[in-house]
Amino acid sequence: MILKEQETLGFQSEVKQLLNLMIHSLYSNKEIFLRELISNASDAADKLRFLALAKPDLYEGNGELYVRIICNKEKRTITIIDNGIGMCRTEVIDNLGTIAKSGTKAFLETIDVKNSKNNQLIGQFGVGFYSAFIVAQKVIVRTRAAGASADEGVHWESTGEGDYIIAAINKPERGTEITLFLREGEDEFLDDWRIKNTIGKYSDHITLPIEIATNSENKNNNIITWEQINKAQALWTRNKVDVSDQEYKDFYKHLYHDSNDPISWSHNRVEGQQEYTSLLYIPASASWGIWNRDHKYGLKLYIKRVLIMDHADYFLPNYLRFVKGIIDCNDLPLNISREMLQHNRITQNLKNAITKRILSMLEKLATQNNEQYQNFWQHFGLVIKEGLAEDPNNSKSIARLLRFSTTHSKSMEQNVSLDEYVSRIAEQQEKIYYIIADSYAAANSSPHLELLQKKGIEVLLLHERIDAWMMNYLIEFNGKSFQLVSKADLKLDKFLNENTTEQKDMTKAFEPFIERVKKYLGDRIKEVRLTYSLTDTPAIVTIDSNNMTTHMAKLIVASGQNKPDIKYIFELNPLHPIVKKVSNTDNDIYFSEVIELLLDQALLVECGTLENPNQFVRRINKLLNHDTIVN
């Protein structure tokens, strides 16, 4: 190769230090160099297509555009070839001699096509080309602009050390040829399988065919044959009416290596101020890392069908981290390495739109296919519950997705929606009642439910660890506020229908007994009172509306903090035989043992444990031997 008019020029921006910083720090993984160079080649093809609309001669009789890759193991080189627009000497100096000057970006500004719906240019920064130096100790570029003569070819060469060589060459073919001379230790990229895998990961859906030489060193006839690597058509760019359900399923399985079909998907193209296409999937089951804080999640982010980020978590709130899929945008603010989003109003608007799209998709699934939604809830219900705290702007939509066990369903399965609950309540019922316990069995058999069950009032049975925390954010639904039935201020007057005069008389008669219990227990409890909300249970403990719930306190302890001090209200059932009997006794020993036992029973039901279970057992044994107490 004869070099003419050779010059050695310095880079026009911060030279060696900037190149060093960019090459060794800007990119998080080495294989990205191939993505960047293929993206540049795709841009070159798109530029040619655009300009050839007005000047067909630019095709020079060959309109079949491509990107081709040759790996030479003997010379330890990788060559990326395109037959796109190419560059003249001035463009080479401007685009390759300046860090962070993008030929694509300048092209857009020059012809003002940023608003063109058919514009497919993906380059945003001039640094993409320099990612070649991540794996290459030297890079040679041979290029010729479309429409120029063969002797107007340009040779560019650099080791990334702060300057470069530029010269004139004879190049019959238009387009650009980039040869990378690999550093020691980078021979993995000479393997065809490695190249194919990287292209499949990052550039599978570029519409330009990407081909690799299969016998570039054929010694007999020196004929190179080419194998196309990419599919060259992004499924999400097709009209959704032309894509079959099976194609959507196969694409999901290919993308995520999941053997199961997705439960649901949503394919949408949005046009307007911010144009983008999204293809969102709901998996059939949760991934192993869904509860691992370090587990990566997020959508695959494409810019003009080129994968920019494998886990663009910014577009998904944390409570929707199980959602998979892609988002393909025409333009997004990226950092200089194109590996990270720059968060601003545009990206926030996209996140809001995608979040609403997913919630709408789930609500549609719940309405149209209850069986599939129940399968979804079984795997992802706990994650959805996080959304009430994380995303208050969408709390109404999230609340509609919640499912509960209730006293009506008589099943541990969480299959009752709040809409269904509200549709069944009596007209005079102003609240949605719920109870929190450590297990379904404990919730379903709680003494706090006795009167409500007797009156046929449905109660939500909450028994998962997150529920106490969640209910701090679930305040109302369809105008109905939520009422924890273990709160002391539970108002059930409308449902009691008892003779209030009789209750008043009984309350007055029990006043001495209540005072006696208060005096005995002292400051161990907040208050002692009678309750008429029990039917089969002698006593319960409750908390007032200003106090932390028992299960919220458990969450605090589980997080490693000190146990909060909760003062319970001790409520006694005056209609229960045990309470009647102890209220009439003069035996102080019997009185103290029974009161202690009733309080321990109530605390055990409420808390699931006691501070001194051995003493509790001793009292039970002592009461079983009643003569011991009497004597």
UniProtKB/Swiss-Prot annotation:
Please provide the record's keywords in A-Z order: ATP-binding, Chaperone, Cytoplasm, Nucleotide-binding, Stress response
Q: Which parts of this chain are annotated as the region C? A: 555-631
Name the principal localization, coarsely classed: cytoplasm
Q: Which domain of life is it from?
A: Bacteria
According to the record, the residues making up region (B) are: 339-554
Q: Name one GO cellular component term.
A: cytoplasm
ATP-binding among keywords: yes
Parts of the chain that traverse the membrane: none
Q: Which GO terms describe its molecular function?
A: ATP binding; ATP hydrolysis activity; ATP-dependent protein folding chaperone; unfolded protein binding
InterPro entries reported in the protein's UniProt record = HATPase_C_sf, Heat_shock_protein_90_CS, HSP90_C, Hsp90_fam, Hsp90_N, Ribosomal_Su5_D2-typ_SF
PROSITE patterns annotated for this entry?
A: HSP90
Subcellular location(s) per record: Cytoplasm
Q: Which SMART domains match?
A: HATPase_c (SM00387)
Q: What does this protein do?
A: Molecular chaperone. Has ATPase activity.
Name assigned to this protein? Chaperone protein HtpG
Source organism of the structure: Baumannia cicadellinicola subsp. Homalodisca coagulata
